[in-house]
């Protein structure tokens, strides 16, 4: 009675016939090959950003290092670095601070969060400072304050204009009150430079916040800013909880500050060198 015979409820497979090949691993894509734009959220092929690291879709300015900015700004081989080798005394003996400094120096190739020296911008000699957010968020400690102060003192003595690219997360907490003192210290040097009739120009880059904003970043004779740069003192949430109001979406953006008279002009990164040269030519080093 084959009609009612039992059948196996499973299928027999010869194990020798089964494929024993391991699934192929997916090809690895290098992390540095693509970047996601914080502005338009598009994924961008790294080469499409160009040398100035600007999003080709929305114009967002990616953060760049001090040396990258130096190459975009000054005449070739004109930069002479000054005030190197200054080290913090670590006044609070803050845990792991010295180790963090050592690792950051190795990673960035900088001795501190600001690069200082003299350079020419289309033939105009200037004292130049560039803060780098890759170095502990360009927080302002005693060495940063000392280097910028010395830069202004040198510029005053040699009758040079000062161009300073600012970027900072604020005062460096690992140095306590000593970091806050740098606000007044640098501002005093700025005032002496100004009293000598010399020209000081600041360029606010993303982010410029905290004590740097509350002092020398906003003391320039002319204040420029990069597109969509975050500029402010306290954080947005702190302000909203204090005033108990919802702030505008573009609050603390460079465009908002220019609209309210705190910034003189917003300059595209690709136009910055020409703009600086023009302003230096207009002023001739004099304010």
Curated annotation (Swiss-Prot):
Its EC number is 2.1.3.15. Pfam families: Carboxyl_trans, Zn_ribbon_ACC. Zn(2+) binds at residues 37, 40, 55, 58. Its cofactor is Zn(2+). Component of the acetyl coenzyme A carboxylase (ACC) complex. Biotin carboxylase (BC) catalyzes the carboxylation of biotin on its carrier protein (BCCP) and then the CO(2) group is transferred by the transcarboxylase to acetyl-CoA to form malonyl-CoA. Belongs to the AccD/PCCB family. This is Acetyl-coenzyme A carboxylase carboxyl transferase subunit beta. It comes from Streptococcus sanguinis (strain SK36). The lineage of its organism: Bacteria, Bacillati, Bacillota, Bacilli, Lactobacillales.
């Amino acid at each position: 009675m084959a009609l009612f015979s039992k059948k196996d409820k499973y299928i027999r497979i010869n194990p020798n016939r089964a494929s024993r090949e391991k699934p192929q691993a997916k090809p690895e894509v290098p992390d540095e090959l693509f970047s996601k734009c914080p502005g338009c959220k598009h994924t961008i092929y790294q080469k499409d950003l160009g040398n100035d690291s600007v999003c080709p879709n929305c114009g967002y300015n990616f953060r760049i290092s001090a040396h990258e900015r130096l190459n975009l700004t000054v005449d070739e081989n004109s930069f002479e670095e000054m005030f190197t080798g200054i080290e913090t005394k670590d006044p609070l003996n803050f845990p792991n601070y010295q180790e963090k400094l050592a690792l950051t120096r190795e990673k960035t190739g900088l001795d501190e969060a600001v690069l200082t020296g003299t350079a020419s911008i289309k033939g105009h000699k200037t004292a130049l400072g560039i803060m780098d957010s890759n170095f502990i968020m360009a927080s302002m400690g005693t060495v940063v304050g000392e280097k910028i102060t010395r830069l202004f003192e040198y510029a005053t003595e040699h009758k040079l204009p000062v161009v300073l690219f600012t970027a900072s997360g604020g005062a460096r907490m690992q140095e306590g009150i000593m970091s806050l003192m740098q606000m007044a210290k640098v501002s005093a040097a700025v005032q002496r430079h100004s009293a000598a009739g010399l020209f000081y120009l600041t360029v606010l880059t993303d982010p410029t916040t905290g004590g740097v904003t509350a002092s020398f970043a906003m003391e320039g004779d002319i204040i420029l800013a990069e597109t969509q740069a975050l500029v402010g003192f306290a954080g947005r949430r702190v302000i909203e909880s204090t005033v108990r109001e919802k702030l505008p979406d573009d609050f603390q953006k460079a465009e908002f500050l220019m609209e309210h008279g705190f910034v003189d002009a917003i300059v595209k990164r690709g136009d910055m060198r020409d703009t600086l040269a023009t302003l230096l030519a207009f002023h001739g080093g004099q304010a």
